[in-house]
Design a protein with these regions (language model features):
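N-terminal secretory/targeting leader peptides
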Residues: 1-81, 99-312
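A gly/proline- and charged-residue-enriched helix-loop-helix capping module
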Residues: 78-98
């Protein structure tokens, strides 16, 4: 497992699952760092059975197949309800893809809190990205920033604080609560409360390992993963708001340390610009690198849900 949400999974699997199964089902949870993994190799390891159960961010697999970007294209889901609807719509496509090509059974898809823009100088809206250097963490967010006239910069999460502090970058995109936890509020001044993307993650299992389990255990695990995924989506919505509150010092922040950032509320013009850039730049670039079947599946699911069309 990996990530902030991975911690939720670890607690759930190591405590809740044994309790609810009365000790009949237990799990040995290991983080990527403990296993010497970076993330992108997880799908291959699950496919071969080296790792039986795993969870990882879909964007890790984007370089292997652009279809893994489909539900998290920058600007596609400006709120958590849309993100969940998009995810649910496309989940059967992923289930088929992983099952047929990788011997992996998809159990569910959860998410991080909203990925939003932190800047170290005044920003009034998305249009102000023009001319700015912005740290991005995926190909689709890089294309989004560049379409707005900004320069995309790739750097590790741990390098962002000094980069913002020393003006190496003007802005950076991360989860609203992740940025708070890393004290980005100490080196940035403005936070734009408009989700750019979400970083959904898959929960999956090697198919052969799954088939060997007792049918009652499979039913139990499937039901519990569904509960876990629902809980993580609820937590992501809550933590997105907590990130806004705590970075800006709002009274609603549940943590003792509060930042003093300015919360920039998106205007109608911001939302329109987000939609325009996604449809005119992000979506066409993604469609160009994904297969014809991939684009067809997108249009039949996500496209139908949102009223958008991707074209090769």
């Amino acid at each position: 497992i990996a990530s902030l949400m991975g911690l939720s999974l670890a607690k759930y699997d190591s405590v809740a699952v044994p309790e609810q199964s009365k000790g009949q089902v237990t799990a040995d949870i290991k983080g990527f760092n403990e296993m010497g993994l970076k993330g992108p190799e997880l799908l291959r390891l699950m496919s071969t059975g080296v790792v039986e159960f795993g969870t990882a961010t879909l964007s890790y697999f984007a370089s292997d197949n652009p279809i893994n970007e489909a539900i998290d294209l920058a600007g596609l889901a400006p709120d958590v309800q849309t993100a969940r609807a998009v995810t649910n719509a496309f989940e059967p496509v992923y289930a088929r893809l992983y099952g047929e090509g990788n011997n992996v059974k998809l159990l569910g898809i959860s998410t991080y809190p909203a990925q939003v823009l932190f800047c170290n100088a005044e920003i009034k809206g998305l249009a102000d990205i023009k001319g700015k250097k912005v740290r991005t963490s995926s190909r689709t967010t890089a294309e989004f920033v560049e379409a707005l006239g900004g320069s995309s910069v790739t750097m590790a999460f741990g390098e962002v604080v000094p980069a913002l502090q020393n003006k190496v970058v003007d802005c950076a995109i991360t989860g609203s609560l992740s940025g708070y936890s890393a004290k980005w509020y100490e080196v940035s001044t403005h936070l734009v409360a408009l989700p750019i993307n979400w970083n959904q993650q898959i929960h999956a299992v090697n198919q052969k390992a799954w088939d060997k389990l007792d049918p009652n255990v499979r039913t139990f695990l499937q039901a519990n993963v569904k509960t876990l995924v629902d809980n993580i989506w609820d937590a992501a919505a809550r933590q997105t708001q907590e990130g806004y509150d705590c970075n800006t010092g709002a009274a609603a922040c549940p943590f003792p340390v509060k930042g003093k950032m300015v919360l920039v509320q998106p205007s109608d013009a911001d939302r329109a610009l987000l939609k325009k850039v996604t449809q005119e730049a992000v979506l066409p670039k993604w469609a160009a690198r994904c297969s014809a079947q991939c684009v067809k599946d997108f249009n039949a699911t996500v496209g139908k849900t949102l009223g958008v069309t991707a074209s090769k």
